[in-house]
Design a protein with these regions (language model features):
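Terminal low-complexity segments of carbohydrate-biosynthetic enzymes
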Residues: 1-121, 125, 399-604
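Donor nucleotide-sugar recognition loop
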Residues: 333-337, 342, 346-363, 371-379, ...
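A recurrent flexible, glycine/aromatic-enriched loop bordering the glycosyltransferase active site
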Residues: 308-338, 388
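Short beta-strand-to-loop acidic/aromatic patch adjacent to the donor-nucleotide binding site
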Residues: 239-252
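Short, well-formed alpha-helical segments that are part of the catalytic scaffolds
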Residues: 166-185
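Conserved donor NDP-sugar-binding/catalytic core segment of glycosyltransferases
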Residues: 256-305
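Active-site donor/metal-binding and catalytic loop motifs
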Residues: 140-149, 374-391
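Conserved donor nucleotide-binding strand/loop of the catalytic core
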Residues: 207-225
Length: 604
């Protein structure tokens, strides 16, 4: 049987990864040679490769694929010892199970093929450690398996990435894909395709296109339109793709993640062939920190990761990430890196036209998706942590939440309308009138029915709603207001009298001005609700502690009363019309997810 490569051993060759070497290996005393031919390990120094990118998730590989053996193949020279170990969690701390140890003395460069021995069923990941003795040189390495060619699946993997004027990201990524995959002389190069959906229509087709890579100018129809176009092109290419990998444009990628995805697909067992491979999103700003590999819709209608944040420089996190986690209701895969078989991603099963936000959630839930995740299959995404965009989070997310629930019958345990009602009330109580309007706009537009979504006006709508975003200035502009950034996310206790007056007067909306305090109170700018801090104030300073910016909010009794009247009318209307409007979305969903619809919508 032929030796088939599963994972390459990789090193932090790019400058951006130098501060994060512990994602690749642990230990000191390893340096790359001047000619970059090998990595030298100093005498009596140990380097451990049981790290995020170089450990092997053996339990998952054995579960999901047809392999029944794994080997470590290392090209080395010199004197050294290799220890192979397995790791697993044991009621808290991780445990190491030493599987083998062997010393070598090689006068010439030589490839070693080491069998990974049998291990206990508890072992989740395996890795290896090299202890250098004399002139120890590591040239390259990989994990492999012996398997018959007839056991492999035919895979044609099409990457579809949607971009909108983000050349700083998309152009380097295109070049990386050409250099590392498309121009390689191997099996994957023949079966890998790239569709760049150019929503901004700013990329030069003639300069960028090559064999197996296409630029598709597209109207700006957001992620939904871009990824729908990508799925369409993957299905219609000369040799139709077996899988389409949806990926954001503003990400940092490692080609090795794509290679591991491809190899995984070629070896999947029959019962897992329709699973989605959900790549993890790590923070661009803190590259060692994993934000999410699978998300879920919480019972309160919010969205978030199944797992808590994990520091992938820590071995315990690397092990824990591959252990089973409690399954949540309404799980989904984010489209920063999501590989879907075209038995699911078909021309008659395209995304809903939501422009942005919620399309990936709806698609996973509509298709009852099951997921495979794995260490090192990931991207780094920027901008998730520092800025709250009200037009996006309050209007777009909530409008789409109502629409996907209505159209696809998902998340029936969640009352999105009630969530929006509560949030609207909170925004009115803290004088954030534009945000209250955005939430009610979301309800109003949802109530217009599916015809509203069938018009390609997403860009214009988001621009109009974006004009309602709060305008922040540096905190230096508010020197007369004392701000403690460490206590912004905090609130004091409230007594019965304070609660009663707060509710009775709607936090000052229905009380005389002499009862209101003139000094502005400092509150958090985003989701955090602090009724005690904002109690009976004329002004509030909403602070973003991450960016050290703020915005003044002022009690406006006239506008507040008008919006309160609209608030009562809006949420009464959705309560009365919900059953009827849901039926309209349900009846129209098949058309809105069809090739016929998307051809017209995209003008192709």
């Amino acid at each position: 049987m032929k030796l088939t490569k599963l994972q390459n051993i990789i090193f932090p060759s790019q400058k951006r990864f130098i501060p994060y070497t512990r994602m690749f290996y642990y230990g000191e005393g390893m340096e790359q040679s001047a000619d970059k031919e090998y990595w030298g390990i100093a005498e009596y120094h140990a380097v451990d490769f049981a790290a995020y990118f170089n450990s092997f998730s053996i339990k998952k590989w054995m579960k999901y694929t047809k392999i029944d053996n794994v080997k470590i193949c290392l090209t080395m020279k010199g004197s050294f010892k290799i220890r192979i170990s397995g790791y697993y969690m044991n009621r808290g701390p991780f445990q190491e199970e030493v599987l083998s140890e062997e010393s070598f003395s090689l006068d010439e460069k030589q490839e070693l093929i080491l069998d990974i021995p049998e291990m206990s069923d508890q072992v989740t990941i395996v890795g290896f450690q090299i202890v250098g003795y004399k002139d120890c040189c590591l040239y390259s390495g990989y994990y492999a398996t012996e398997i018959a060619e007839t056991e492999k699946r035919e895979v044609r993997l099409a990457l579809a990435t949607t971009t909108f004027k983000k050349e700083d990201f998309i152009l380097p990524n295109i070049q990386l894909l050409k250099d590392e995959i498309l121009n390689a002389e191997d099996e994957m190069a023949k079966n890998f395709y790239v569709h760049v959906i150019d929503n901004g229509r700013t990329l030069n087709k003639e300069e960028l296109e090559c064999d197996h890579l296409w630029i598709h100018p597209n109207p700006n129809t957001g992620g939904s339109g871009g990824f729908s176009r990508g799925i369409i092109e993957a299905n219609l290419q000369k040799e139709p793709a077996t899988h389409v990998l949806l990926m954001d444009d503003d990400v940092i990628i490692l080609p090795e993640s794509l290679k591991r995805t491809y190899r995984l697909l070629t070896l999947l067992k029959e019962e897992y062939k329709n699973h989605f491979i959900s790549g993890a999103m790590l923070y661009y700003e803190r590259m060692n920190e994993q934000h999410e590999d699978i998300g879920y819709v919480h019972d309160d209608g919010s969205y978030g990761p199944v797992k808590h944040r994990l520091d992938m420089q820590r071995l315990d996190a690397v092990v824990r990430n591959e252990e089973p986690w409690a399954k949540r209701k309404n799980q989904y895969a984010g489209w920063w890196y999501c590989c879907i078989p075209t038995t699911v991603a078909r021309l008659d099963n395209l995304p809903l036209p939501l422009f942005v936000r919620g399309d990936d959630v709806e698609y996973s839930l509509r298709n009852h998706a099951k997921f495979i995740t794995m260490n090192s299959i990931c991207v780094w995404h920027m901008g998730f942590t520092l800025k709250f965009n009200a037009a996006m989070e309050l209007y777009q997310v909530h409008r789409n939440s109502l629409a996907i629930q209505a159209a696809s019958g998902i998340c029936q345990n969640i009352d999105f309308a009630e969530r929006m009602r509560k949030f609207t009330r909170v925004e009115l109580l803290r004088f954030n009138y534009n945000s209250a309007e955005l939430l009610m706009d979301a309800v109003d537009d949802y109530l217009k029915g599916p015809a509203f979504f069938e018009k390609p006006n997403g860009e214009q709508i988001l621009k109009e709603k974006g004009a309602k975003n709060e305008q922040f200035e540096p905190l230096s502009k508010f020197k007369n207001i004392p701000v403690d950034l460490d206590t912004v996310y905090g609130d004091g206790p409230r007594g019965r009298k304070e609660k009663f007056i707060y509710r009775l007067t709607f936090n000052g909306l229905f009380c005389p001005d002499f009862m209101l305090k003139k000094e502005p109170a400092v509150i958090a700018y985003d989701w955090f609700y602090a009724p005690h801090r904002q109690y009976l104030r004329k002004k509030l300073l909403a602070v973003n502690p991450h960016m050290q910016t703020g915005a003044i909010r002022t009690l406006d009794k006239k506008r507040g009363k008008e919006l309160l009247k609209r608030y009562r009318k809006t949420f009464k209307e959705i309560e009365q019309r919900q059953k009827t409007i849901r039926k309209k979305y349900q009846d129209r969903r098949a058309y809105m997810t069809s090739y016929e619809f998307w051809k017209k919508y995209l003008g192709i």
